[in-house]
C-alpha cells in the first residue's frame, strides 16, 4: 500500500527548507498546493493514473516544482518531498546533491517530461 505525503508534511518540509536555506515563507496558492499533493492519487474509472510509486513521485515533483504553490522554495520543496515520498515507500535514493540540483533545475525548466522524470528517479534508486 502506498504511503502518501499529507499537506501538513509538505508544509513542514517547506517551512524547514526555507528557514534553513533562505527565502520567503508562505503559500502563494493553496489550490495549487492541494492539487500537487493530490495528483499522485489521481484515478480514472477506478484505475490509478500513476500506477507505480515512481510515477506517483514524478507527478508530485512535477506539480510542486512547476505549479509554484509557494512564494519561494518550490524546487527545494519539490525534490525533498519526492525523496521523502520514495523513502516512505521503501525506496533508497542514491543521487548526490549535485545530481539532485541539476535534475530539479531540468524539471523546473520543463526540459524533461513526466516519463523522463520517472526513468531518472528509477535509475537513482535502490530497493
Where are these regions (language model features)?
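FIC/Doc superfamily catalytic core
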Residues: 1-127
